A protein has these predicted regions:
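A donor-sugar binding/catalytic signature common to diverse glycosyltransferases
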Residues: 85-87, 100-106, 251-300
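Conserved catalytic-core segment of nucleotide-activated headgroup transferases in glycan assembly
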Residues: 18-28, 156-236, 249, 358
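Catalytic binding pocket for nucleotide-activated donors in carbohydrate/polymer assembly enzymes
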Residues: 272-350, 354
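Active-site and donor-binding regions of nucleotide-sugar-utilizing enzymes
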Residues: 10-161
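Donor nucleotide-activated moiety binding/catalytic core segment of transferases
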Residues: 68-72, 76, 227-275, 279
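C-terminal alpha-helical cap of glycosyltransferases
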Residues: 359-378
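Short, flexible/disordered intra-domain loops and linkers
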Residues: 42-48, 218-231, 294-300
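Short acidic-hydrophobic, aromatic-tinged amphipathic segments that line or gate anion-handling sites
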Residues: 63-69, 247-251, 318-328
Length: 378
């Protein structure tokens, strides 16, 4: 690696929801003269997502690489002769974007309970940055031979940088009632519980602030695997219009991380958000009721085969509060806020397993690993 020019590194935010994992690394490298930063996103994405992602990426430090087609994007990125290419998943022909000499790394876009975590591992990956020892073991046990490096979860770094003023500004911008506890409701798009709540969600939570953060697919997709997402989208808008205490975050709010800090309890399904919230040792309520498509109602095992890891899904019950029906929400909120201390020891065990070091320095470990691998190559 020549020392006469900066290291060319591109962050490929294939989808906008990949970007929160990259943001702390981008911020770190933007203050490091050894690196020249580039950004890109998939040109085949739906226009509503593509336009928003391009707007966000244009605001980031570095150079945006845009093309009208994926073929043109491949050519433009390959012509950069990158030193490093970072992706958030690897289920596309990465080898066509880079030369054989490019170091390809993956900071995976989620830490949740989906089997895709270990199924998504292209042979073109040179290195994979891993959030915790549990995941290291899981990848190895599923036959992954990529160079695995234990760094911690970069996405969580901002939670440990002590930016209290920013968090206070966030509270004020949402006009949260300071006399009420705050619920962060982060329903995934499928399988989701929000339709089981319906408009009753507003009634069940009248004594709280609610920050409602739907998955981006709720906004961007009309259908997912024959499941209609339009009613979900209509419902979240109706809830925020009818109830003043429900604050809806639009798709432009692509990063949920700051909202963990200003919330008292997380409400969700089996998703990555669980492991992100426990980094702050706050209570998590997991909804065990969903609106399912017919094939998953009839053959529940298909849900676990395609969407969930049964082992991790079962583990959640050890450190979360589980809810079997929507009408239990008022009492479950009280229980979770009062009794979370009973689960702290187990929660801390899972922190160590899933999240390695919660010191705000995962991004530094990613940077140092990149520098080390490039140095050893030369």
């Amino acid at each position: 690696m020549s020392s006469n020019r900066p290291i060319k590194i591109l962050f490929d935010s294939y989808h906008l929801y990949h970007l929160p994992q990259f943001d702390p690394v981008i911020d770190l490298l933007s203050h490091d003269d050894r690196f020249e930063i580039f950004h890109s996103t998939c040109s085949d994405n739906k226009k509503i997502e593509l336009d928003l992602c391009l707007t966000v990426l244009e605001s980031k430090p570095g150079t945006l690489v845009f093309a009208e087609t994926e073929e043109e994007r491949m050519e433009k990125i390959r012509a950069l002769d990158l030193d490093v290419f970072i992706c958030g998943w690897s289920r596309y022909p990465i080898g066509k974007f880079v030369s054989n000499n490019t170091l390809v790394g993956m900071i995976y876009h989620g830490i949740g309970v989906k089997p895709s975590y270990w199924r998504d591992n292209s042979t073109r990956l040179n290195i994979r940055f891993v959030e915790g020892q549990y995941r290291m073991d899981q990848l190895v046990n599923n036959g992954i031979e990529t160079d695995l490096v234990l760094t911690g979860f970069t996405k969580l770094d901002p939670l440990f940088h002590g930016d209290d003023e920013r968090f206070n500004d966030l509270k004020n911008s949402l006009r949260l009632d300071p006399n009420k506890k705050t619920i962060l409701f982060a329903p995934t798009f499928y399988p989701s519980s929000i339709e089981k709540f319906g408009m009753k969600l507003g009634e069940y939570t009248m004594d709280y602030n609610v920050i409602l953060k739907p998955h981006m697919w709720t906004y961007f997709l009309d259908e997912f695997s024959e499941y209609n997402l339009k009613p979900q989208r209509k419902l979240v808008y109706n809830l925020s219009e009818k109830f003043d205490h429900i604050k809806l975050l639009g798709p432009e709010t692509y990063n949920i991380i700051p909202y963990y800090q200003i919330s008292d309890v997380l409400l969700t399904e089996a998703s990555s958000t669980i492991y992100e919230m426990i980094a702050l040792e706050k209570p998590v309520i997991v909804n065990r009721f969903f609106r399912l498509k017919l094939s998953h109602k009839l053959f529940r095992y298909r849900l676990f085969r395609k969407r969930l890891s049964k082992e991790m899904n079962d583990d959640i019950s050890n450190f979360c509060f589980e809810m079997e029906k929507a009408s239990d929400l008022p009492s479950m909120l009280e229980t979770s806020l009062q009794d979370n201390y009973n689960k702290l020891d187990i929660m801390r065990d899972y922190q160590k397993k899933m999240l390695f070091q919660l010191d705000g320095k995962a991004s530094q470990r990613v940077r140092d690993t990149i520098l080390d691998r490039l140095e050893n190559r030369s």
